[in-house]
């Protein structure tokens, strides 16, 4: 386990990017070689505009972050009285000063696979190294004289514990005798229902509007890889918006004129917040309520990023009681959970919180298929194997025709060699005779590229699924594979785990594991079953590809290498069967 952790930590993201580029180039060589180096052998075949909304398009930051003494989270949590949160998926607390949701830990996910690893901290209070919290409040209009709760207000709770079976009410009464209530309830996963209430017990009308805000102080460390989005995410007016933290800094700075129209929006329903690779925190307004949305960057000693919305103006007469509802999701972006919320709570396009990429029409089905197989197999490694078999069955007709053509090409090797010897100095005549031979025997020299060409989008879709979906996070296979989303942990430089050596990062690419070696061997064996390319240069390049792919895939997720290896084994079996059948037919 220690060797595994050390090796995985040494493979930094720059190396991952280089590996990703290398495999793309290698696949391109396989598929398009004959196009890049052609030979004459063959010819390549808003609806809420009338509602009364708060006049401000930006939520004033109620709490400006200033340079302060950073304290451990435990010390900060001990300062104020809190309501504890306990569910099968979350632990944490709500700060009764300000009614701030600022303490959440994911119960089922750890930072690493070490036995003593801490659980993932999602939200943290102000005063810690990386504050990240959610506020709920009210703002008054113009010369509104009513006393409103703020971030210094001390709320009273009717219960000390928030659980799936026990909601809580936080209440505060102003000097004007107006009562403000915030009701929190939570399900067994990651969804909070939050209702803000106001009871006007004064003798005058209240003109106020609600706001909800997510704030993140300090720029979080991101993976910064082009196939993954981390930062602001929102769906307003059915338009998915993804902006990184630099975009907010450059275009939505609170201290400068707003540069981009995305910083403010009007809409109804949807969701908005911040996303990491595997986790996110988003506000989910009532789908029937119009809202003003804004996104901002600020800096008062530390960079801060906030997103939130304000609701419509409430004119509350004496004796009247109003409610403002909405939800908060704070947790892991698990596909089945997001799908359930989409269906049961009608949260639009909620599964798009997972970064499916440009080819979502492929990536989503791949993810759903693997999760479906996992439901029966109980192991994601077995699910990947089952998915590979399914793909082979779907592509069987194409692969069968391709392998038949390659088998015919292999059978024609002696005839092709004789033509080369017959016309050593007349290449044009030799090519004409070769074309006639191919036509007579029904062989296609480029047919072998077709199955590979079809596999490319499947390969990259699986890569994306392994990279961005939390289902693969720390998902074990069998034996030495403890995490299918990480590279094979046993490498040749550690004698496959027999030597305790912390391999330097620059040597990680040659610290080839067992699965990549198996993949390379199966690829080499598969090539041996194919006819040798007629062009000597092409033959040399193809001969090197198993070695290139072995090194390239050594740094990729074990689940991806498992897919490739199983796919090679199935291809070998299919090729061997077809060639045996053709040979038997000709005997």
Regions found by a protein language model. Give the residues of each.
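Juxtamembrane extramembrane loops of integral membrane proteins
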Residues: 26, 35-122
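Helix-loop-helix
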Residues: 2-53, 94, 196-197, 209-226, ...
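Generic detector of low-complexity/intrinsically disordered segments
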Residues: 5, 55, 150-153
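Generic structural signal for short, solvent-exposed loop/turn connectors between secondary structure elements
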Residues: 65-68, 73, 164-167, 178-179, ...
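Intrinsic disorder/low-complexity detector
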Residues: 6, 20, 49-52, 62-63, ...
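Soluble non-transmembrane domains of integral membrane proteins
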Residues: 82, 86-348
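Non-transmembrane, membrane-proximal soluble domains of secreted or membrane proteins
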Residues: 64-81, 88, 268, 300, ...
